[in-house]
Curated annotation (Swiss-Prot):
Compositional bias of kind Basic and acidic residues: 414-444, 456-465
Region (Disordered): 396-476
Stated role: Involved in pre-mRNA splicing.
GO molecular function, one term: pre-mRNA 3'-splice site binding
Membership in a protein family: Belongs to the SLU7 family.
Protein name: Pre-mRNA-splicing factor slu7
Organism of derivation: Aspergillus fumigatus (strain ATCC MYA-4609 / CBS 101355 / FGSC A1100 / Af293)
Length: 476
């Protein structure tokens, strides 16, 4: 008896669905049992295609024959604007020429799931990594050919060596490249320390005082021997003597071994390494001198490469301590007179002094002739006498030139009258000066203030117009 195949509803029994819904009605044919009428209540499991990605550069069908409105002005495609166009910018775009109109790109709607959105390798083409593999194989081939056993390396690449020879060759290659798997992780990560510890510089028990807790030398270790000269300060060893030369030799050995030219070991055979290094230095220097000579012969200019004789007199570095002040000058140095930007001590027009050497009545002038006119001709002592006479005439002490020309020279009897007139004018001048001085307030009076007598006299002498209430007097 053959069993009836179970339908979809009987596979998953749900106790929360009533029986009148779960059971098949009598009017339902058996042929339709394959169709689950409760499919809308089932959990829909849609398998998303995680490998779905954009088809880059795919075009949709043939290109248009003429420009369409709204298309790219550069290439004529409808799927992007002109500022988003990735084609070469044309001098005249497809909008104006109507030629070489590109086909439209395929705009795809890629809907990815939760996992596909976070897949970092989604859309990656594995064929792109083939270029990296080929480059690596080419480098490996070049490395093996540059080694001393180039023929063995060629046999390994061709697969002609047996397993034992291949293992020996691989071990040698791994030892030279320092990348072998037979080395442990600790061995590969260990840094080779070839510097000497400070507590081993001097093995005298009384000199080196090393504190293991703080890992430092007390009193910088030995102070009187050669070992202490190498110690400059904490955790620093001064490079002195042949230290720099040793470092260059060590670097040359390492670089030569990396290039695969020679297998130089500085500690095992230092003599050969030194000879090869000096030989290479001599060859390099000879090439440089030959190139320099060829350039000088071709272009010239050897006279400009000679040392200048004034180079020895230039300021060189010294240990003399110099202290500067706030203005930037050397502190304690004698101050030089500040020079003006204008020309100084330039004597013109027979003057013996410069303009501005004499001051009178708020005017600058020449001290040699008392002239206040700039760039005037010097008159010397005559000019001074003329200036004094003009001053006396302005003060009224001497008669004017018109009066002296009109009157005749005074007689002997009139000389006394002239002297009396001069005495009278002197007395009047002194009297005027005395009155002026009495009107001026002295410094003591200004400091002491206004006295009561002065205030009373001021109030009496003040005009009535200054009083604002004076206008109301007599109006009532």
């Amino acid at each position: 008896m053959s069993r009836k195949p179970a339908d979809v509803a009987s596979k998953e029994r749900n106790e929360y669905i009533p029986s009148f819904i779960a059971k098949k009605p009598f009017y339902i044919d058996d042929e339709s049992t394959a169709n689950d009428y409760l499919e809308h209540q089932r959990l829909q499991k849609q398998a998303t295609d995680q490998s779905k990605w954009y088809d880059r550069g795919k075009r949709a069908g043939p290109a248009a024959t003429k420009y369409r409105k709204g298309a790219c002005e550069n290439c004529g495609a409808m799927t992007h604007k002109s500022k988003e166009c990735l084609s070469r910018p044309r001098k005249l775009g497809a909008k104006w020429t109507g030629k070489d109109i590109q086909a439209d790109e395929v705009v795809q709607n890629v809907e990815l799931g939760w996992d596909a959105k976070r897949d970092r390798w989604n859309g990656y083409d594995p064929s792109e990594y083939r270029q990296v593999i080929e480059e690596y194989e080419e480098l490996e081939k070049l490395k093996r050919n540059t080694k001393p056993g180039a023929q063995d390396g060629k046999k390994i690449m061709d697969g002609e060596l047996d397993d034992e020879e291949a293992a020996i060759e691989e071990a040698r290659y791994a030892e030279e490249s320092d990348m072998g798997r037979q080395q442990s992780t600790a061995t590969r990560n260990l840094r080779i320390r070839e510097d000497t510890a400070k507590y081993l510089l001097n093995l005298d028990l009384d000199s080196a005082k090393y504190d293991p807790k703080t890992r430092r030398m007390v009193d910088m270790g030995a102070q009187d021997d050669q070992a202490a000269a190498l110690v400059a300060e904490e955790n620093f060893v001064r490079a002195s003597g042949d230290a720099a030369e040793f470092e260059r030799a060590q670097r040359y050995a390492w670089e030569s071994q990396e290039r695969g030219d020679k297998k130089i070991h500085l500690q095992a055979n230092p003599t050969s390494g030194e000879i090869l290094r000096k030989k290479e230095q001599a060859e390099t220097e000879a090439k440089r001198q030959a190139q320099r000579k060829a350039l000088l012969e071709k272009y010239g200019g050897e006279e400009y490469l000679k040392p200048t004789p004034l180079r020895e007199t230039m300021v060189i570095e010294n240990e003399r301590f110099v202290e500067y002040d706030e203005s930037g000058a050397i502190k304690g140095a004698p101050k030089n007179a500040v020079k003006s930007k204008y020309p100084e001590d330039v004597l013109v027009n027979n003057h013996t002094t410069v303009f501005g050497s004499w001051w009178h009545n708020f005017q600058w002038g020449y001290a040699c002739c008392f002239s206040t006119v700039k760039n005037s001709y010097c008159t010397g002592e005559d000019g001074k006498k003329a200036f004094e006479e003009a001053e006396m005439r302005s003060m009224g002490l001497l008669p004017g030139p018109e009066t002296s020309d009109q009157t005749s020279p005074p007689a002997k009897g009139e000389t006394n009258d002239i002297h009396e007139a001069e005495d009278l004018s002197d007395r009047s001048q002194r009297k005027a000066d005395t009155e002026t001085n009495t009107r001026k307030r002295t410094m003591m009076e200004m400091k002491s203030g206004v006295s009561e007598e002065e205030l009373e006299s001021y109030k009496r002498s003040r005009l009535a117009a200054d009083d604002p209430m004076a206008s109301f007097i007599g109006k009532e």
